[in-house]
């Protein structure tokens, strides 16, 4: 049995630890914060095979150019002189070509479906303590232009074997008996599911603790020691830790951590915001993405979460209240009588999504070291891809045949 250190206690790191433990490894998790403060905790809670189009696509570039200089738009890049951002931006632009997007759809589709199945297995094994519901997800639209685009996407989904159902405005309203819905129509993806991400993380965390997995929380990585082609030790502000293998899954901090090993990663942190309203009297029945405004709406039992935006402004940037107000305004535009009020600032959550330039994650070994696995860059799909990523990481560490071809996720594809 080998000892494996997992750096990162978000949903990606926790799922890696879960599968490594199941694979018979001794596992130690090191996390810079605690389990409930990371990006995974406040996200929309989707596990979405419907999201088979990579972030880097011709559509997002066209829209992004319109949006990027408005601080209240769904996509915003804070103008600044930053060499890493410039490198990332140029690569993102190149990888957004249609030819690259079409090449990346099959592996993204495969890992999404693998993860969807594995998420159900985790629920079946640990119990549904994280409020997982399998009612699908709506893509709702208000304009004819967006309707045309979403119906074209539905046809692409069908070609991949993904079921879709197209609804007019009346059909959407019938699916939401408690609230008025102001839309032109929507596309439902029945395969999608949703859950409470914080509850999922707590469920896995408590399970691993009960099995003897060690957690070192509020512990910052300061460096590593190497012996030949192996990482031998991780140095932290709480002491040093040795292991046979190391998995780095530190989210938007991944390139900061890998620099200690001389590894440069193209990755930017994209900030997203969410608000969670408790005990909503007349709540949504269906999760939905408000496509024209890029806002996600997720009922979580009697609670309701709304979130969105992609703000590339650096890890030290403050909250932009305009962006949160834009999310709330969009929600009220689609659901005029939704019984919620704009929250106070302390109830607004934000976190950072780690963005690779092509929208695909980094999963695999780095050629500089025989015992190092990187896992990051999942963008808005961290929860959707967490279970599959954890499974693949365990297979890589164990020297097993992976459940799918991971060539597209090569951690050195931009070298």
Predicted regions and their residues:
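Glycine-rich FAD pyrophosphate-binding loop
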Residues: 22-41
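Dinucleotide-binding Rossmann-like beta1-alpha1 core, especially the glycine-rich loop
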Residues: 44-167
């Amino acid at each position: 049995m080998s000892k494996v250190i997992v750096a990162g206690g978000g949903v990606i790191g926790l799922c890696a630890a879960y599968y490594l433990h199941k694979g018979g490894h001794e596992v130690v998790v090191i996390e810079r914060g605690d389990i409930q403060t990371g990006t995974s905790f406040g996200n929309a809670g989707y596990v979405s095979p419907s999201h088979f189009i990579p972030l880097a696509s011709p559509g997002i570039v066209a829209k992004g150019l319109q949006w990027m200089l408005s601080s209240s738009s769904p996509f915003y890049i804070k103008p600044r002189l930053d060499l890493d951002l410039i490198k990332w931006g140029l690569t993102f632009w190149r990888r957004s070509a249609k030819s690259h997007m079409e090449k990346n759809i099959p592996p993204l589709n495969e890992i999404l479906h693998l993860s969807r199945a594995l998420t159900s297995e985790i629920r079946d094994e640990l119990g549904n303590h994280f409020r997982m519901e399998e009612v699908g997800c709506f893509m709702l639209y208000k304009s004819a232009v967006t309707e045309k685009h979403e119906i074209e996407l539905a046809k692409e989904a069908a070609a991949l074997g993904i079921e879709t159902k197209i609804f007019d405005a009346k059909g959407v309203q019938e699916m939401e008996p408690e609230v008025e819905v102001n839309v032109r129509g929507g596309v439902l993806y029945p395969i999608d599911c949703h859950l409470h991400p914080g509850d999922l993380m707590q469920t896995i965390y408590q399970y691993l603790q009960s099995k003897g997995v060690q957690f070192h929380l509020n512990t910052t990585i300061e460096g590593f020691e190497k012996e030949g082609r192996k990482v031998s030790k991780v140095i932290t502000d709480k002491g040093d830790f040795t292991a046979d293998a190391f998995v780095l899954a530190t989210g938007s901090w991944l390139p900061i951590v890998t620099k200690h090993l001389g590894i440069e990663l193209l990755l930017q942190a994209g900030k997203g915001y969410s608000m969670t309203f408790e005990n909503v009297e007349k709540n949504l029945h269906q999760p939905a993405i408000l496509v024209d405004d890029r806002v996600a709406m997720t009922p979580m039992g009697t609670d309701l979460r709304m979130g969105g935006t992609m703000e590339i402004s650096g890890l030290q940037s403050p909250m932009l209240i305009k962006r949160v107000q834009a999310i709330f305004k969009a929600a009220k535009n689609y659901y005029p009588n939704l019984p919620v009020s704009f929250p106070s600032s302390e109830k607004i959550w934000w976190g950072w999504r780690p963005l690779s330039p092509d929208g695909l994650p980094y999963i695999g070994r780095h050629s500089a070291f025989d015992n190092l696995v990187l896992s990051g860059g999942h963008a808005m799909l961290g929860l959707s891809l967490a279970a599959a990523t954890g499974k693949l990481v365990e297979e890589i560490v164990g020297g097993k045949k992976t459940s799918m071809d991971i060539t597209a996720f090569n951690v050195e594809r931009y070298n």
